[in-house]
Amino acid sequence: SLVCCGDDPMIRDLMAPFSKKIIYYGLNANNDYQLKQLEPFENCEYEVYCEEEKYCSLKIPLPGRHNALNSLAALIASTEAGIDLETATQGIENFNGVGRRFEYKDEVDGVIFYDDYGHHPTEIKAVFNSFRDRYPGRRLVVFFEPHRYTRMKDCWEEFIKELKEPDLVFVTRIYEASETPIPGVTAEAIVASVPKAQLLDMNTKWEGEKLNPYFQQIQDEIQSNDICVTLGAGKINVIGEKLIEYLKDHA
């Protein structure tokens, strides 16, 4: 069996030639399993319907529509593999997530810090939507470390579109991951394209007091009640931890 998100027309087109059993899930009514009554906040709660009849209810300790959809896919795959519904439901409801995915880090002077591994526009969009759902009305501040010159070049317009969504974005130098720089693909170019962005002209591999001027730059901009997120696949999570230490020492 193939378990696919039927909300995406492209996936349905790709699956059309296959003769295997295909099970579609999602938010739309034309799916085999439909997710309804979604509350995508601190804990996602939702109901699952199959052929217009209620199949089960789920509550997972992870926020966001994408996590709700992922958990529904896991539930369907589990039952298709022969696991009974009650056991599958309990297992999914007890799953607490993984590191670097919407990971709570700390709170300093009313500022809440999270970390997420998101480094592709689709992931980033889902992350931002989750924070907006969980913390409506609060300022979203993002510390973004671009990852790979080629990825930034290939998805440039998509990155710029998503990075315009937060209230403030700090952009570090691009984490090269052994790639050769590409002319025009720079942190400065990102900042120039995103009105609410500031350049953190730093390398996330730096350590010690060399980081302090950039931490001071951040401290001057963030406010109590902000939601701050380190975002990227390089070393930005380590910088986030050092930033928290700095803010505690300079409160």
Predicted features along the sequence, with ranges:
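Short, well-ordered alpha-helix to beta-strand connector turns
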Residues: S19, P166-D167, N225
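Acidic, Mg2+-coordinating active-site environments of NTP-dependent enzymes
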Residues: S1-F113, E188-S193, A197-Q198
